[in-house]
Amino acid sequence: MYRTGLRRRLSAMHFFDVPGPEGEAHPHPYLVELLVAGDELDARGYLIDLDAMAAALESAIGLLEGKVLNELPQFSGTPPSVENLARTIWKMAVGRLPPVEWASVTVWEGDDAWASYGAWIDG
């Protein structure tokens, strides 16, 4: 199976319903990776056009950039954890991608802390 990925940066804020620093809105400089996979390449030898992939990811990230995640409808009733952020970006980006078999989004909250969400795409 072929895999193609790209990364973009996202700055956003969040808070949790807990006492202490995590309970106050605080920023994160996230690194977001979109990865797609499939068995077939097109006539150009591409799994996916990187420009189309970048447009899908940048469109999703653009809706979150500089925002307090808790205040967005995508996180209504959902804690803005890095896990839920990965799933939210996945849902927002996959609908804008050309047909692919599988996709995942990984969100890094620091150099060594990350969460990922991925799934097969129904065609």
Regions found by a protein language model. Name each.
Residues M1-G123:
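Charge-rich, low-complexity N-terminal segments
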